[in-house]
């Protein structure tokens, strides 16, 4: 089957590696004071691609944890995708120039779709769109506001734009270890041609196994945060399952 990627997540707040519950900045748990060391740990465990979010940047609308991100880029060799506060071409270009493999555009995908299309055209394969849904509607501004449009409506705007991936997060499950909302994620993936990455709620090895079933074949992979930090998913077991599925 196609290669499924399990992305370990590092969320940055005040230069530290944290996890939030349902995107609430007041419900943050610090997991590592040194994000670069956490990134190195994930690489040493065998992960192939790192997912990083500048939480402060998502709220501020511009990068707030650049120092921590740059330290990670100097520490690991695996590709890094980054979201949070990327709302104009200058910011996007600066991150790509610094070595970010793929940038994730969230709020601006709702507010300024022309920017996403221009960026994807200019940087093929390096621009992803992050769609974070609350009750089916896309949330913006670090999830502080909910728009009136659905994830599918937004995704369809970019069907022919060259967007590398859609990262779909179910806010209701994020950080709560309730399991992925695979039904909604697969429904989105089946309705568009852009690869979709599942996010929010991945809780156990069973969620990883579900990603490897035929019905999830259009998913590029999934992002895991709290389940890895809490030890609910054994990296070696998860990566071995994925490796076996690739060879099948």
From Swiss-Prot:
Matches recorded under InterPro entries: Aldolase_TIM, His_biosynth, HisA_bact_arch, Isoase_HisA-like, Isoase_HisA-like_bact, RibuloseP-bd_barrel
Its pathway, per UniProt, is: Amino-acid biosynthesis; L-histidine biosynthesis; L-histidine from 5-phospho-alpha-D-ribose 1-diphosphate: step 4/9
**EC identifiers of the protein:** 5.3.1.16
The record ties this protein, via Pfam families, to:
His_biosynth (PF00977)
| Active site (record annotation) | 11, 132
Subcellular location per the Swiss-Prot or TrEMBL entry: Cytoplasm
Catalysed reaction, written as an equation: 1-(5-phospho-beta-D-ribosyl)-5-[(5-phospho-beta-D-ribosylamino)methylideneamino]imidazole-4-carboxamide = 5-[(5-phospho-1-deoxy-D-ribulos-1-ylimino)methylamino]-1-(5-phospho-beta-D-ribosyl)imidazole-4-carboxamide
Q: Which GO terms describe its biological process?
A: L-histidine biosynthetic process; L-tryptophan biosynthetic process
According to the UniProt entry, where is the signal peptide?
A: none
UniProt key word Isomerase: yes
User: Coiled-coil stretches, from where to where?
Assistant: none
Instruction: Check the record and name the CDD domains matching this protein.
Output: HisA
Q: Which keywords does the record carry?
A: Amino-acid biosynthesis, Cytoplasm, Histidine biosynthesis, Isomerase
What GO cellular component entries does it have? cytoplasm
Q: What main location does UniProt list? A: cytoplasm
At the top level, the lineage of the source is Bacteria
Q: Which GO terms describe its molecular function?
A: 1-(5-phosphoribosyl)-5-[(5-phosphoribosylamino)methylideneamino]imidazole-4-carboxamide isomerase activity
For this protein, the record's PANTHER family field holds: 1-(5-PHOSPHORIBOSYL)-5-[(5-PHOSPHORIBOSYLAMINO)METHYLIDENEAMINO] IMIDAZOLE-4-CARBOXAMIDE ISOMERASE
Family of the protein in this entry: Belongs to the HisA/HisF family.
What HAMAP family does its record include?
Answer: HisA (MF_01014)
Name it: 1-(5-phosphoribosyl)-5-[(5-phosphoribosylamino)methylideneamino] imidazole-4-carboxamide isomerase
Protein source organism: Afipia carboxidovorans (strain ATCC 49405 / DSM 1227 / KCTC 32145 / OM5) (Oligotropha carboxidovorans)
